[in-house]
Regions:
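Beta-strand-centric surfaces of beta-sandwich/beta-rich domains
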Residues: 1-156
Length: 156
């Protein structure tokens, strides 16, 4: 798994290790959160509800930020001064030991920060996502997108 993204075969092989040879249906899927008006020095928390009928293999996290919904192009992208902490309720594990800088952890356009390894999140669980701004004065709008595949296992 050395490429910029995980290949389909790599994701299939990863999933099959955990489902003990059962037939699998993998469907590309994503979950999006929008944090509106994150003011300087504040924090906000939102929850992602994982589908009840499938597990989710997370392959990448992306974000897009803007200040006051201002237009952007490649050279004027906003690098938000915010930290993210993600907790999986199914395993009660945090993705990192503490909140980390969003730009260091998530992909923002041409800034590529891939997860080192896919992560399985159980169906019917939730991800609690906290963003904390450390901006001096800007109010941010930030979308955080969780990219991956839904996994449905069937009886043999």
């Amino acid at each position: 798994m050395e490429s910029q993204e995980f290949a389909i075969g790599e994701i299939e092989a990863f999933a099959s290790k955990f489902y003990q040879g059962r037939p699998l249906l993998l469907t590309p899927y994503g979950y999006n959160l929008t944090f509106s008006s994150l003011t300087a020095g504040s924090s906000a928390t939102q929850v992602v509800n994982i589908a009840a009928n499938a597990d989710f293999i997370l392959t990448n996290i992306h974000h897009r930020a803007n200040v006051a919904a201002a237009g952007q192009n490649v050279s004027t992208k906003v690098a938000p001064l915010a930290r993210i902490l993600i907790t999986d309720s199914g395993s009660n594990e945090q993705f990192t030991n503490s909140a980390v800088d969003l730009e260091n952890y998530s992909t923002n356009g041409n800034i590529i920060n891939l997860l080192p390894y896919p992560r399985i999140i159980s169906g019917r669980s939730t991800l609690t996502v906290q963003l904390a701004s450390y901006e001096a004065s800007q109010t941010l709008n930030i979308d955080v997108f969780f990219e991956g595949v839904l996994v449905r296992a069937y009886a043999q």
